[in-house]
A protein has these predicted regions:
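Short amphipathic secondary-structure patches
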Residues: 2, 37-40, 44, 52-108, ...
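Alpha-helical assembly-interface signal, strongest on the long, hydrophobic N-terminal helix that forms
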Residues: 1-72, 154, 158
């Protein structure tokens, strides 16, 4: 009579072991779903904070790494309150790295050991500042590279300057009107710009040229335009940045002139800073820095083609 009892006890023990094993698996799966999901959400939240920090800090580059660090830390901790201060480094003058980490609690997973009481989640973001190789919303006014503020001279920005266009001496002018509909790698390929009228130039000044335009190409210089529309266009943009192509060379073919465009500058016309008559054409204002957010990454900053207009992109 003892044999059946022993067998029942043995079977009962096996059932208990089986149930415990099943419960362990079920709890493990629940931990994977609940805790794993929680940890992934924490990591995504942390990554968003790191991305925001890198993009914000990059706006201070290349001249102010201290300011970039302060801005990045502020943005990171605003977007994820309570996290430890991220580590901010600069691989080069135009790049900022933000490495952040925090802990996320375990709920069910902690039954498998104290190591799962909390887990460390990490995030890394890298933002890069570059010079746009293409520019949108460009005004049809080119400025000489020796007059535009270089990014390597930050004290130049905000200083009042007057730029002059003299049709009788285009090659020595510090600004010039451009035909933005034609550009080429060949210096004189665009020919005459006589088909571009004053109303068209006014529209480009007020609204910017609608297409992205390339640097490192030649553009035709527009002369003989109607004075009134140009003046009205400039008046409509007083106090707001105008994007000027920057030229370094002048070529000519007969009576036609061409500027070689190497980069982009942002210029703000001051109130009362417009003198645009038949023989006296001047603009008074200041150059400023500008961050373009809707352009692809471009060339190296702080070089000969960097005049303070930058684009910022997340590269990691």
């Amino acid at each position: 009579m003892r044999r059946p009892s022993s067998r029942l006890q043995k079977d009962s023990g096996q059932v208990i072991v089986f149930v415990v094993a099943i419960l362990t698996v079920v709890i493990g799966m629940a931990a994977l779903v609940i805790d794993g999901g929680s940890w992934r959400r924490a990591q995504r939240h942390l990554q968003t904070a790191a991305d925001a920090a890198a993009l914000a800090g990059a706006q201070n580059l290349p001249t102010d790494q201290s300011g970039a660090t302060s801005t990045a830390l502020s943005y990171a901790q605003t977007n994820y309150p309570g996290i430890p201060a991220p580590t901010v480094t600069f691989p080069d003058t135009g790049t900022i790295d933000v490495a952040a980490q925090t802990t996320a609690p375990g709920i069910l997973a902690r039954i498998y050991g104290s190591v799962f009481n909390t887990v460390t989640v990490r995030a890394h973001a890298r933002a890069q500042v570059s010079v746009p190789l293409y520019m949108k919303n460009v005004a049809p006014v080119a400025v000489k590279n020796t007059v535009a503020c270089a990014a390597t001279n930050p004290g130049c920005y905000g200083q009042t300057v007057t730029v002059v266009f003299d049709e009788s001496q285009v090659s020595s002018s510090t600004i010039g009107l451009l035909n933005l509909t034609c550009h080429s790698t060949a210096s004189t390929a665009c020919g005459s710009s006589s088909g571009i009228g004053g109303s068209q130039l006014q529209s480009w000044i007020e609204d910017g040229y609608p297409d992205a335009l390339p640097a490192n190409e030649w553009y035709g210089v527009k002369t003989g335009e109607t004075v009134g529309p140009i003046t009205h266009g400039f008046e409509a943009r007083i106090g707001t940045p105008l994007f000027f192509p920057v030229f370094d060379q002048v070529a000519s073919s007969g009576s036609n002139y061409f500027f070689h465009i190497i980069g982009w500058a942002a210029f703000v016309i001051h109130p009362g800073g417009i003198t645009w008559g038949p023989h006296d054409r001047r603009l008074t204002g200041h150059f400023t820095t500008f961050i373009a957010t809707d352009l692809a990454s471009g060339g190296q900053i702080s070089g000969a083609t960097d005049f303070g207009v930058h684009t910022i992109t997340l590269v990691q």
